[in-house]
């Protein structure tokens, strides 16, 4: 399933929420940083189960939960307004659903930045067999 997410990110056009989320991550952590989070731990990438492996993986768990609360539009496809101001992500004037998606992505990108010291290369492309514990509730 994670491979499908990678393909989806690669195939998405110049706009679209996943592309915008990738730009937020790269803006906070540097060019091409998004590739470090596409398949990481138990929650970064498509789907998720088990217990987050570290603070970085927990950022993805919280992001998944946030997307799960969004109502009224598709979080992975909707296009929202945002910008960077003095290194900070600022969500623009969006309606309720788009505002919620932007906030989910902004919080996750900031979380990755705040927890970059917990990033563990051993959790990249982690086998799903290492994520079989009972999943936490959002």
From Swiss-Prot:
Matches recorded under InterPro entries: PLipase_A2 (IPR001211), PLipase_A2_Asp_AS (IPR033112), PLipase_A2_dom (IPR016090), PLipase_A2_dom_sf (IPR036444), PLipase_A2_His_AS (IPR033113)
Binding residues annotated for Ca(2+), in chain numbering: 43, 45, 47, 64
BP-aspect Gene Ontology terms: arachidonate secretion; lipid catabolic process; negative regulation of T cell proliferation; phospholipid metabolic process
EC assignment: 3.1.1.4
Keyword terms: Blood coagulation cascade inhibiting toxin, Disulfide bond, Hemostasis impairing toxin, Hydrolase, Metal-binding, Neurotoxin, Platelet aggregation inhibiting toxin, Presynaptic neurotoxin, Secreted, Signal, Toxin
Gene3D superfamilies with a match to the protein in the record: Phospholipase A2 domain (1.20.90.10)
PANTHER family with a match to the protein in the record: PHOSPHOLIPASE A2 FAMILY MEMBER, PHOSPHOLIPASE A2, MEMBRANE ASSOCIATED
Family: Belongs to the phospholipase A2 family. Group II subfamily. D49 sub-subfamily.
Protein name (database record): Basic phospholipase A2 chain HDP-2P
Classification lineage: Eukaryota, Metazoa, Chordata, Craniata, Vertebrata
């Amino acid at each position: 399933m994670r491979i499908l997410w990678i393909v989806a990110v690669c195939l998405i056009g110049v706009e679209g929420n996943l592309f915008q989320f990738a730009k937020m991550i790269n803006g906070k952590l540097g060019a091409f940083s998004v590739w470090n989070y596409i398949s990481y731990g138990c929650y970064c990438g498509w789907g998720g189960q088990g217990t987050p492996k570290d603070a970085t993986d927990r950022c993805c768990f919280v992001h998944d939960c946030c997307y799960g609360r969004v109502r009224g539009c598709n979080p992975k496809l909707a296009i929202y307004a945002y910008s960077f101001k003095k290194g900070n992500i600022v969500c623009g004037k969006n309606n309720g659903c788009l505002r919620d998606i932007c906030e989910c992505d902004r919080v996750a990108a900031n979380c990755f930045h705040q927890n970059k010291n917990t990033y563990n290369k051993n959790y990249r492309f982690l086998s799903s067999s290492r994520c079989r514990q009972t999943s936490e509730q959002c």
